[in-house]
């Protein structure tokens, strides 16, 4: 994999758009450019379109989930596992693992694939699934060979969001001959997957971009204290000089007046109030979601032909809420009046 590491404000999207446009795409092949959000994908499309008055047909730009589903699962999953998914589901899932698994199983029985399972299913297509038969492995080789025959390269934006399943997918495609080019910033791995950092450490083809077109150097001096040596950033000479100070609320009589008087260009205030939990889930929320799921299944079985799934979801939410309110007041979970 070719790895490009660039921090915030380094112009990653613009750089990637330039390199994509310069990519020598053979006749009959396409280049895929994938991002992790719709906004990021739209931004890349805009950058590419600006350079050539529209996105060429041999450059496919989409979100990662759209790519995995449309390019891997939809055309090939049936040939390996004899199952076709007719639609995608974005319905909420219960927090309880038991009920979550039940919900996912029910969706698949109905021919629906939940969006959270897309990376795993795509991994089964190109990488492996436990207990694969020889026949499945043989078909997978043909799938990879065919995909490589028309895919010239895959560019990945915001690569710090790569999860284990997506890493396995990209690794399998690379072994099949597809060129993989990553752009990202491990310092922005807010989801904590850690796979982009592992890729950087293992790769022999890593490029660092230190320029920052967004922040004053004085701000970067602070952030650089937390960055690895190769990932420290330098402000562009045209950036504003800027200033940096930290003010505690206890030292200020009137926060609103202080901010308005000082006339800051940007000001970020972090304020939270309430009860906070350090354990993984809140019992009340889990009870509600479990109850809502059961109510939804019962309603769906009765009214699936008469109304939409979203309307049933709304009704289940309302009924579950009323049932818990009734339980708090009477100790009885049954719903007497709505």
Tell where the protein language model's regions lie, with residue ranges.
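The feature marks helicase ATPase cores and/or their adjacent C-terminal helical subdomains
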Residues: 1-336
């Amino acid at each position: 994999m070719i790895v490009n590491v660039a921090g915030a404000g380094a112009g990653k999207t613009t750089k990637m758009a330039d390199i994509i446009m310069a990519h020598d795409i053979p006749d009959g092949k396409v280049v895929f450019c994938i991002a992790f959000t719709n906004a990021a994908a739209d931004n890349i499309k805009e950058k590419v379109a600006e350079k050539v008055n529209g996105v060429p047909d041999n450059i496919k730009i989409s979100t990662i989930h759209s790519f995995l589903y449309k390019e891997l699962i939809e055309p090939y999953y049936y040939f390996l596992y004899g199952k076709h998914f007719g639609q995608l589901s974005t319905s909420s899932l219960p927090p309880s693992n038991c009920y979550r698994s039940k919900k996912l199983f029910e969706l698949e029985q109905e021919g629906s694939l939940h969006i959270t399972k897309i990376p795993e299913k795509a991994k089964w297509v190109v990488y492996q699934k436990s207990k694969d038969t020889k026949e499945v492995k043989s078909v997978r080789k043909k799938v990879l060979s065919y995909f490589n025959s028309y895919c010239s390269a895959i560019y990945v934006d915001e690569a710090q969001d790569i999860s284990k399943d997506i890493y396995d997918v990209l690794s399998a495609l690379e072994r099949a001959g597809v060129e993989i080019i990553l752009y990202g910033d491990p310092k922005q791995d807010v989801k904590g997957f850690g796979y982009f950092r592992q890729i950087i450490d293992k790769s022999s083809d890593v490029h660092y971009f230190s320029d920052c077109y967004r922040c004053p150097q004085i701000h970067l001096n602070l952030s650089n204290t937390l960055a690895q040596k190769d990932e420290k950033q330098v402000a562009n000479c045209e950036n504003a000089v800027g200033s940096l100070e930290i003010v505690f609320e206890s030292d200020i009589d009137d926060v609103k007046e202080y901010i308005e008087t000082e006339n800051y260009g940007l000001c970020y205030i972090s304020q939270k109030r309430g009860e906070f939990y350090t354990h993984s889930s809140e019992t009340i929320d889990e009870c509600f979601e479990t109850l809502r799921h059961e109510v939804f299944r019962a309603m769906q079985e009765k009214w699936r032909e008469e109304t939409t799934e979203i309307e049933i979801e709304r009704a289940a939410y309302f009924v579950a809420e009323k049932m818990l309110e009734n339980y708090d007041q009477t100790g009885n979970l049954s719903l007497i009046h709505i």
